[in-house]
Amino acid sequence: MLELNFSQQLGDLHLQVATDLPAQGITAIFGLSGAGKTSLINVIGGLTRPQQGRVILNGRVLVDAEKNIYLPPEKRRVGYVFQDARLFPHYRVRGNLQYGMAASMRGQFDAIVGLLGIEPLLNRFPFTLSGGEKQRVAIGRALLTAPELLLMDEPLASLDLPRKRELLPYLERLAQDVNTPILYVSHSMDEILRLADQVVVMDAGKVRAVGGLEEVWASSALRPWLQREEPSSILRVSVIGHHDRYAMTALALGDQRLWVGKLDAAEGNSMRIRINAADVSLALQPPHSSSIRNILPVKVAECLDVGGQVDVKLAIGEQWLWARITPWARDELGLKPGQWVYAQIKSVSFNRQNGPVPD
């Protein structure tokens, strides 16, 4: 558990954070430029000192301003991956990886190298590497220090699109195969959707929302960032099985079934899906004949007027589904909170896929 309760004045920015974060998975720190994202992880990493408050990691006090306790960065057991890789230019990749490597990680060296796909790079110097390769080496070096927490400050920000696409699959593998919790700073929605388990939304130095990705995505906290885009829903599902006759896969969504094009995934695998609100239409009764395969009963939670459209928040089990309709459709259907309707889902896209769902 990472316990944060501190304040810090940085020029015009007043950083004020009071929240607890789980010591597992990837927690995305999200917000616009100047929101305080990097300032937050700099306090955790020991690069800056807050004027008030405490930072506690797994019961160890990293910061207690009132007692003048500021554990130096090298004693915090916190790894840091910067926007630029900051490799030692006079060391080969192997030397960079071994610099600061914890004795307990010597037996893990080959596994980390394999996980990040950098074995062919071990004898090369940093100046011969691409941006994506440098970042993979930087991540490996940080992991080999045996950190209790890994901080990543927009590791894709300095990369062009091809290099981002090159590095993202390795970050996804990292999320699945390494037990080290990660705080991942980003202002990219796409990165967060692919990588994050939890999300912290920051604005003007303060935490505006914190929770699981699906929960925060469905809340109003992200709406200021989503208004320019088509709203969507993020849902957690698992594979039930595959159709005997058609190239279709059945997914469990709560106690309901969702059909999608056939996936190369075993029964029990969990994954995250994204459904655009414009791909969800509503009906008071299920149609008798329709080309749409997914027609699910849902309960209306609220209706929001947004720029001449209506966004309808729908409860589906313990998760939330958004539909975007016209005011005319809302009035004709007589939609109101608590009402049961049928959601017709036309299209589904996929984000990160995980392993079997535990019992």
UniProtKB/Swiss-Prot annotation:
Amino-acid positions noted as binding ATP in the UniProt annotation, renumbered to this chain = 31-38
Task: Offer an example of a GO molecular function term for this protein.
Answer: ABC-type molybdate transporter activity
Residues covered by the Mop domain: 289-354
Q: Where in the cell is it found?
A: Cell inner membrane
Q: Kindly list the cysteine pairs connected by disulfide bridges.
A: none
Principal location class: membrane
Which reactions is this enzyme annotated as catalysing?
Answer: molybdate(out) + ATP + H2O = molybdate(in) + ADP + phosphate + H(+)
Identify the InterPro entries for this entry: AAA+_ATPase, ABC_transporter-like_ATP-bd, ABC_transporter-like_CS, Mo/tungstate-bd_C_term_dom, ModC_ABC_ATP-bd, Molybdenum_import_ModC, Mop_domain, P-loop_NTPase
Q: Which domain of life is it from?
A: Bacteria
Q: Among its keywords, does the record have Secreted?
A: no
Keywords annotated in UniProt: ATP-binding, Cell inner membrane, Cell membrane, Membrane, Molybdenum, Nucleotide-binding, Translocase, Transport
Q: Which residues form the ABC transporter domain?
A: 1-229
Kindly indicate whether the keyword Metal-binding belongs to this entry.
no
Q: What GO cellular component entries does it have? A: plasma membrane
How this chain sits in the membrane, per its record, is: Peripheral membrane protein
Q: What is its EC number?
A: 7.3.2.5
Q: Say what the protein does.
A: Part of the ABC transporter complex ModABC involved in molybdenum import. Responsible for energy coupling to the transport system.
Describe its partners and assembly state: The complex is composed of two ATP-binding proteins (ModC), two transmembrane proteins (ModB) and a solute-binding protein (ModA).
* Annotated PANTHER family: ABC TRANSPORTER I FAMILY MEMBER 10 (PTHR43514:SF4)
Q: Which family does it belong to?
A: Belongs to the ABC transporter superfamily. Molybdate importer (TC 3.A.1.8) family.
Query: What is the name of this protein?
Result: Molybdenum import ATP-binding protein ModC
